[in-house]
Amino acid sequence: VLSNHILETHHVYVKESLPIISEFANKVAKVHGASNPENIEIAKLFHEVTMELQQHLMKEEGILFPHIINLAIAHRNNETISVPFGSVQNPIRMMEHEHDIAGDVFKKIEKLSNNFTPPAHACNTYKALYHHLKEFQDDLHIHIHLENNILFPKAIELEKE
C-alpha cells in the first residue's frame, strides 16, 4: 500500500514537476544569469538532478517496487520467492545512496537561492522558480523519508521472515 502511495503521489509529482521547473530554471538563468549568476548554477544543478531522478524512478518502478510488492504477497501467502539481485538490501542501498545525492544537490540549490528567497527585483518567473524549487524539495524530503525510514526497512524485514 505504501509503495502505491509513493508511486501515485510522489513519483507522479516528480515526473510532472521536473519539466516545469526545468523550463523556469532555464528561462531565469538565460534572462537573469548575467546579473544573478547563481541562477546559471541552479539551472545546471537542477538539470543534473533531473537526469538522476528520472533514472532513479525507472529503477524503483521497474525493479525495486515490484519486488517489494512480490515480497509482501509471498509473505502474506507463506511463500518464498527468488531474488534476482541477491538481497533486497542491494538495490535499497543503491536507492538510499541516490537519495543522498539528490538531497545534497538540493542543499546546494537552497544555498545558492538564499533559502529559495528571490531578490526584490525578481519577475514572476523568477519567483515561480524559487517557489517550485522549495515545494519540490519539501516533497522530496517526504518521499525520501517514506522510502528510507518506512518502506525499505519493512522490505528488509519481509525478506528476512
PLM feature segments, named:
Residues V1-E161:
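Small-residue-biased structural context
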